[in-house]
Amino acid sequence: MSHRLLVLFLTVLVLSPMAHAENSDSVIALSTDNDLFAPTQTDRDYTAGLAITYSSNSEDFLGNPVSGISQNLDRFVLSGIGADINEPESAALEFGIYGFTPEEIKARDIDRDDRPYSSLVYLSSSHSYRTLSDDSGWTTSMTVGVLGLDVFKSGQNAVHKVVGSDRANGWDHQVSNGGEPTFRYSAAYHQYLD
């Protein structure tokens, strides 16, 4: 599947429940960061990121396919540790991309004493739950993604050409070059204050 089809599919998947949301609190957030915005404008350790997040407490959105998968995982994990939870109060889906570069970007060879090139394209599903006692809660997050796709090389070098920065020459040596699936799950407990 091409990268454009993947992005289109994920966008439709994330945005389709929004058309059905009624009487709910919903938020769309777009975040971007780039070393270009930093005072020193250095590519050391990080170069750029972009994410779009949609969160809502609507029942339609809570029932979207990605949230359904992660809610099943939440029930399995949280019941396994004895957490008594209600249905989720809210859910969020985030689609993002991040790129990391070493300090010395002009070198074509690998420098084992510097951070490697790497990129991550991901989809994350998170939920907020209250416990049955209503005095505490849980926040969970399931992230699936792909490391090492060729998504930053041309973009970074195009921006660098416009702003007069050095060309990044080591993207062919990035971590998991060509693509490797990745997965992350987290569950955080919260005790509410009176």
Q: Where is each model-derived feature located?
A:
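Bacterial N-terminal signal peptides that target proteins for export
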Residues: 1-7
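Cleavable N-terminal signal peptides
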Residues: 8-9, 19
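Outer-membrane beta-barrel biogenesis signature
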Residues: 21-25, 39, 64-86
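Short glycine/proline- and aromatic-enriched beta-strand/turn motifs that initiate or cap beta-hairpins
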Residues: 21-61, 93-105
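Short acidic, Gly/Pro-enriched loop/turn segments at secondary-structure junctions
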Residues: 61-64, 134-135
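Outer-membrane pore/translocation modules
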Residues: 75-194
